[in-house]
Amino acid sequence: MKVLGIDEAGRGPVIGPLVVAGVMIPERKFSILRKMGVKDSKKLTPERRRFLARKIRRIARVFTVKISASDIDRMRERGFNLNEIEKIAIKRIIPEAQPDRVIIDSVDVKPERLEEEIRSHFGEIEVTAEHGADTRYYPVAAASIIAKVERDLEIESIQKKNRKLGDIGSGYPSDPRTREFLESFTYDELPDFVRRSWATVQKKKQ
């Protein structure tokens, strides 16, 4: 049975993309992920995540969807919330992967509602959506690692290309470096990798 795990990185940051990743692997290879030490990306150092991401790519099929800050803003202007935006990415990955079963770290407060939505959209597919799925299912833990590594690489790329603008920090609103970076611009001057629809930034309009 081909099992697809899906997770994301970058829901909360004010800078950079939302990254949704899928990792598809035959069920018989779950033990390989376990032996490799695959677990929830938040419990791993950046170096360990990158090491594991390379190994995951060797034994599994990997899918990523990156939704830029400006695309997030455009979609929010059209009335989409962040959960709906993430679901759009999930629905791009599933048909490309064509799994027998999909396990999702639920974006919906009611996981069963997400399960029903995916089933009705894709027909006869076995769906599991749970909060904290990245701590219980190896393919989802692997997807969380891929998503975090890809998101970190995107942030590094943004920083390198925009070094003259200053230190962007981690991109999270709680990061003092990120806050200082945002404070150096008026709302209209903000670069396109900043999510203007975030409350942190909206305050600048006032």
Curated annotation (Swiss-Prot):
One of its GO terms (cellular component) is ribonuclease H2 complex. Its cofactor is Mn(2+); Mg(2+). One of its GO terms (molecular function) is manganese ion binding. It is found in: Cytoplasm. Manganese or magnesium. Binds 1 divalent metal ion per monomer in the absence of substrate. May bind a second metal ion after substrate binding. SUPFAM superfamilies: Ribonuclease H-like. One of its GO terms (biological process) is mismatch repair. CDD domains: RNase_HII_archaea_like. Keywords: Cytoplasm, Endonuclease, Hydrolase, Manganese, Metal-binding, Nuclease. It catalyses: Endonucleolytic cleavage to 5'-phosphomonoester. Residues 1-206 form the RNase H type-2 domain. The keyword Nucleus does not apply. Pfam families: RNase_HII. It is an enzyme of class 3 (hydrolase). The keyword Nucleotide-binding does not apply. Its EC number is 3.1.26.4. Its main location: cytoplasm. It comes from the Archaea. A divalent metal cation binds at D7, E8, D105. NCBIfam families: ribonuclease HII. Endonuclease that specifically degrades the RNA of RNA-DNA hybrids. Belongs to the RNase HII family. This is Ribonuclease HII. The gene is rnhB.
